[in-house]
Design a protein with these regions (language model features):
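Short acidic/glycine-rich loops and adjacent helix/strand connectors
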Residues: 1-260
């Protein structure tokens, strides 16, 4: 699948000329799908056509963490539907040339395609435009290329990754699952919970510590309270609007009570 909230940037000779998110053109928040209009905008702003592009970089590399993926499949034995879904997604992302040919007929793609591991792309996007020449960078989200977090030291043109948190543990999944449980079902509703949090009381602090907790090399989830690691959680984007199925398990309801 082409995931939610896609954006495009157009650097020319090392200088950023244009950047845009597809949702700004589609007028659908977190629009999910191939970002044809954002690409067209960036090409116009840069004064070039698709055939003039030298390098096409994508924030996903299916080859990243491949041994981790194989090990998880062998040890955890996830549902066949979950495995097939991941394979379909990888195949879809590999078809970028076909997507561009449909969106820009008559403009052949001559650029080399560069696959950038998900969290390395996040780190690059913040460090490269920061005022610092040396900094510690941390990337935390749901999942990308079988990892949910990465951190390292960046210096000059060198982007270092010293460690990662791998699937199935994820603070993004933890936050999204609790957001769903609290009655905010839409993708991206986490900001609403964040805004409401200062007005609440830590009544369930002890219970929540069972869901996510620190370990020696990072953090882990209490996996019995989540579904994503053992079965396929539906992800759809009807009309461009992303929707993710329920991430929490029945055990979470037993711990915290009925969903709100």
């Amino acid at each position: 699948a082409w995931v939610k909230a896609h954006g495009v940037t157009a650097p020319v000779d090392g200088r950023l000329i244009a950047a845009a998110e597809e949702e700004r053109f589609r007028r659908i928040k977190h629009w999910a799908g191939f970002p044809t209009q954002a690409i067209a905008y960036c090409l116009r702003e840069a004064g070039v056509q698709l055939r003039d592009v030298d390098c096409l970089a994508m924030n996903s590399d299916p080859r990243a963490n491949v041994l981790r993926k194989v090990g998880f499949a062998l040890l955890r034995r996830p549902s066949p539907r979950l495995v097939l879904d991941r394979l379909r997604n990888a195949k879809k992302r590999a078809s970028i040339g076909e997507e561009l040919a449909r969106a820009f007929p008559g403009q052949p793609l001559r650029a080399r395609t560069l696959r950038v591991e998900h969290h390395l792309a996040h780190i690059a996007s913040c460090f490269s435009v920061s005022p610092f020449q040396r900094a510690v960078a941390v990337s935390v989200d749901g999942f990308g290329d079988f990892a949910s977090a990465a951190w390292g030291l960046c210096e000059g043109q060198t982007l270092g990754v010293a460690g990662r948190i791998h699937f199935p543990h994820s603070l993004g999944i933890f936050y999204q699952a609790i957001t769903q449980f609290l009655g905010f079902p839409n993708y991206g509703d986490e900001y609403k919970v964040m805004g409401l949090a200062p007005y609440g009381k830590p009544s369930f602090a002890r219970e929540l510590r069972q869901l996510a907790y620190p370990v020696a090399d990072g953090f882990e989830l209490g996996l019995r309270y989540f579904r994503h690691h053992r079965e396929r959680v539906p992800y759809t984007w009807t009309g461009g609007t992303p929707h993710i199925g329920t991430l929490y398990s029945d055990e979470l309801c037993q711990l915290l009570g009925a969903p709100r």
